[in-house]
Amino acid sequence: VHQEAIVPGTVYVAPGNYHMAIEHNTIQLSQTEKLNGVRPAVDVLFESAAKKYTSDLLAIVMTGMGKDGTVGMTHVKATGGVTIVQDEETSVVYGMPGNAVKAGVVDAIYDLDDIAKLLHDIER
């Protein structure tokens, strides 16, 4: 996946122990320092995606421990993108979504089924 060209409509998943970023319409993997105590960290991806896609970006944080995603969502909001988190009721762990909500960087809160529907509708 490293340096692979980004293809619209494709889902990319960061491999374990690698940060994923977007640079010049390609996937960039790195083993740079852990961020928020983790690698991969979604903050790395969101920050790079915000620079590339600005207001065309939709960032979603779903269930997870810690605060990863909050700083990245701040960048997404600053460049005009849209931010969504999974609701507390359908999250196994509400750490990541909850921290983003507390930081005030979330446009909408959806349950898991509504996130799936949204992604399905966007793909069409």
Tell where the protein language model's regions lie, with residue ranges.
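Conserved acid/base catalytic micro-environments in cytosolic active-site loops
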Residues: 1-124
